[in-house]
Curated annotation (Swiss-Prot):
Signal peptide: none annotated. This is DNA ligase. It comes from the Bacteria. It comes from Lawsonia intracellularis (strain PHE/MN1-00). Its cofactor is Mg(2+); Mn(2+). NAD(+) binds at D43, S44, E45, Y46, D47, S92, L93, D123, R146, E184, K302, K326. Zn(2+) binds at C420, C423, C438, C443. Keywords: DNA damage, DNA repair, DNA replication, Ligase, Magnesium, Manganese, Metal-binding, NAD, Zinc. The active site is at K125. Pfam families: BRCT, DNA_ligase_aden, DNA_ligase_OB, DNA_ligase_ZBD, HHH_2, HHH_5, Nlig-Ia. It catalyses: NAD(+) + (deoxyribonucleotide)n-3'-hydroxyl + 5'-phospho-(deoxyribonucleotide)m = (deoxyribonucleotide)n+m + AMP + beta-nicotinamide D-nucleotide. Its EC number is 6.5.1.2.
């Protein structure tokens, strides 16, 4: 198709920028939700952003990339648990939100499978942690979380403590050689309330919702913690099965077999033989939603005929034969007491609504995000208003609108502050942004958040130094910049309550290790330069020998680099021109914290430069390290098998991906050969 044809249009600069903004927003909230189990926004806000990105990518196919969140499942996994690849990818589900969208899904099925009558296995969409149980000859041998879909966290010992998970399958004499059971770990509403009461008695942090409690309970290094939590596993499908001839004709038969093997399955599961039955099922479960034992946020429909499922296959992210129909967000009314302003790391002033506490779908809500001044004005939200609050099973809800009929005649519009509430300096709107910013880098709020970011996983990832310790160090005046962290002594730390000699020594040791192992790209990333994340930091580290070279780069020099436009270039230059930042960089130099460009960061062409690779099976080295080595050698690491791959690096027990690679005549390398070829320079 010609790009000049009427069916193909090129995106404008504004549309390209919007795609970048949406990807950054979605990736950030994926990390909070999947990795930290600590979501900040409602499902409906997330779904709205995801659907907008999906629409833009479908309208302008040139914008679609393999690393877009629309092409991936979940997020990276935490590093503290061992990781292991799935034999078969654990996919996510695409969503529909209305009857029209459901009908659209049916039309796509009909176009792909004409003249095939459709029946659907329907069950509730459970809101928990996705899990894979691996049985060999009927015996439970391992358990993995979904992770990023390709690689999961090994949680076998924790999972063995969940009472309703069979350690040995019923009728195990006839069990397959290998059977992977997939399902969801959940906590009932009643058990969740009891758990939070216990947390409260112990003066521990309360869990935000049952999903967070379930996820956090499974992802424990100490299985006794998991054992103390009221977890249940509900099985909804299978992964790999060997021998592969042992398969079922329909999904409802499979669900019956899961029960026979001893698994609990999602309640209210039903075979629906028509679209009308599916719609009735949706309406019925929506009405029963809050009377069910477990929290649900929609229903899942899968084609019942498994042969039809296999014909339809998968996209990079989700099956084509299944869909989740999400319930609308729960709405309630409460009083908006007042609006507070918070100041973040980049100086953004964020309004937060303080609400009269109200129960929404089993959770007590007392705060809601208002995002920015424009949202407050557009919705005409005022302190003292009765407001409609919307929550879709998450932590922070959103205010939909005020109830104008209840508004007092004395009500006044909220006036957004034009000075920073922390340092009392003037705030600005830069380049027509919606956000107001404090640009005073000496602002205590910015300084605090900058140092917290510096040591965080997104920064240097210094173990054992958390937000609370940074707050103590900053408020007491012990440190003022990230560089000051490396001047700390054990004696400094021992002046603080609850800081014993052992913990103080461990903290200093962690700082010393960070100083010794710091790479240039990691330091650039940790500086918290606006618009500079890990990928951009890598590009900068591969293009400039040290911070001096980067700080003296012109706008033209910066804009010549891939993925760096005028806005990012201006932000980088502004950072290095700031007096406080110049002083901090000089501090790093004086303390000999001065990483330089590594050999791996140069543009020397190696064996794998520009090649597309995929890792499968269990490797001797951690998967994350192998991925890093490949990327530093110039390779592109893929997650799915396709004819575009150049090499598959296979470890032990590679599963079906190896077979598919051989069918496509893709070159196969073992781990030692891969490591050997990394050293070849062309």
């Amino acid at each position: 198709m010609s790009i000049n044809s009427p069916q193909y249009s090129l995106p404008s600069k504004k549309e390209k920028q919007r795609v970048r903004e949406l990807r950054k927003f979605i990736n950030h909230h994926n990390y909070l939700y999947y990795t930290l189990d600590d979501p900040e926004i409602s499902d409906s806000e997330y779904d709205k952003a995801f659907q907008e990105l999906l629409t833009l990518e479908n309208t302008f196919p040139s914008l679609k990339t393999n690393n877009s969140p629309t092409q991936k499942v979940g997020n990276n996994i935490l590093k503290k648990l061992e990781e292991q690849p799935h034999r078969q990818r654990m996919y996510s589900l695409d969503n529909v939100f209305s009857n029209d969208e459901w009908e659209g899904f049916l039309k796509r099925l009909a176009n792909a499978l004409p003249e095939v009558p459709f029946s659907f296995w329907c069950d509730p969409k459970m809101d928990g942690l996705a899990l894979e149980l691996i049985y060999e000859k009927g015996q439970l041998t391992s358990a993995l979380t979904r992770g990023d879909g390709d690689i999961g966290e090994v949680v076998t010992e924790a999972v063995r403590t969940i009472s309703n998970i069979p350690k040995r399958l019923k009728h195990s004499i006839n069990a397959p050689e290998l059977l992977e059971i997939r399902g969801e770990v959940v906590i009932s509403r009643a058990d969740f309330k009891k758990l939070n009461k216990e947390q409260e008695k112990k003066k521990k942090k309360l869990f935000a919702n049952p999903r967070n409690a379930a996820s956090g309970s499974v992802r424990q290094l100490d299985p006794t913690i998991t054992a103390s939590r009221p977890l249940r596993f509900l099985a909804y499908g299978i992964g790999e099965i060997q021998p592969s001839s042992l398969k079922w004709n329909t999904y409802h038969e499979l669900m019956s077999y899961l029960k026979e093997y001893g698994f609990e399955t999602p309640p209210k599961g039903k075979l629906c033989i028509s679209s009308t039955e599916v719609q009735s099922y949706y309406t019925r479960l929506q009405a029963q939603r809050y009377s069910l034992r477990y929290e649900i946020d929609g229903i899942v429909m899968k084609l019942d005929d498994i042969q039809s499922q296999e014909k339809l296959g998968y996209t990079s992210r989700a099956p084509r034969f299944a869909i989740a129909w999400k319930f609308p967000a729960t709405q309630v009314q409460t009083r908006l007491l007042q609006i507070h302003i918070q100041v973040g790391r980049t100086g953004v002033l964020t309004p937060v609504a303080e609400l009269e506490p109200i129960n929404v779908g089993g959770a007590t809500i007392s705060r809601a995000t208002l995002h920015n001044e424009d949202e407050i004005k557009n919705k005409d939200i005022r302190p003292g208003d009765m407001v409609i609050v919307q929550r879709a099973g998450d932590v922070i809800p959103e205010i939909v609108s005020p109830i104008l009929s209840d508004r007092s005649a004395k009500s006044k519009p909220f006036v957004f502050p034009k000075i920073c509430p922390v340092c009392h300096e003037k705030v600005y709107r830069i380049n027509n942004e919606v956000a107001w910013r404090c640009i005073n880098l000496s602002c205590p709020a910015i300084r605090l958040q900058s140092i917290i970011y510096f040591v965080s996983k997104s920064g240097l990832n210094i173990q054992g130094i958390g937000q609370r310790l940074i707050e103590l160090l900053v408020t007491s005046g012990c440190i003022k910049t990230p560089a000051d962290l490396f001047t700390l002594t054990t004696a400094d730390l021992l002046t603080y309550k609850r800081m014993g000699a052992k913990l103080a020594a461990k903290t200093i040791q962690a700082l010393s290790l960070a100083k010794q192992t710091m790479s240039l790209h990691r330091l650039i990333c940790a500086l918290g330069i606006r618009h500079v994340g890990e990928q951009t930091a890598r590009i900068l580290a591969s293009s400039f020998i040290d911070l001096d070279a980067l700080s003296s780069a012109s706008l033209e020099d910066l804009q010549q680099l891939s993925e760096i436009g005028p806005e990012v270039a201006s932000s980088i230059q502004a950072f290095f021109k700031n007096k406080a930042n110049i002083q901090m960089i000089n501090q790093f130099r004086e303390m000999n914290i001065w990483p330089i460009q590594q050999v791996n960061d140069t543009t020397t062409k190696g064996f794998f430069t520009g090649k597309k690779l995929l890792f499968t099976g269990t490797l001797e080295r951690p998967r994350a390290e192998m991925k890093r080595l490949a990327e530093e050698a110039g390779a592109i690491v893929m997650t799915g098998i396709s004819h575009k791959l150049d090499y598959v690096i296979a470890g032990k027990n590679p599963g079906s991906k190896l077979n598919k690679a051989q069918e496509l005549h893709i070159s196969i390398l073992d781990e030692p050969t891969f490591l050997q070829k990394l050293l070849i320079v062309l």
